[in-house]
Amino acid sequence: AAQQLPVSTQQLRVYIEVNRAPFGAGARSFIGETLTRLGAQNILQAQPDAFPRINPEFVLRAQPDLIMVSERDMTSMLERPGWSSMAAIKNNRLCAFAPAEQDVLVRPGPRLAEAAHIMANCLKRFSS
């Protein structure tokens, strides 16, 4: 999947929300590792936990270029104070994954290649 992505993908700073609590996919998670292999930058790179609970203000300050989230968590994410001012949200640079896609993304195992393709398709849509 990574071989099909444009070089501009490497400049994309991405936030992946795995749960509305909110928990994000850190660099040490299988999701974060997949994102790195695809060439994008994880805004949670410095987080020591695989799936850290995130302070919403951290994401607001980080100003990711792209946000990946499940469709079912999208509404609550968009209602967070200040998030409507984020460029990624104002410019609709969001990938909202259907429940079946989200299920593939958040479960490690034999479908990890499929998860990589789902993420790669999202990245392709927003790389210039």
Q: Model-derived features: where do they sit?
A:
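N-terminal ligand-binding lobe of clamshell/alpha-beta domains
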Residues: 1-128
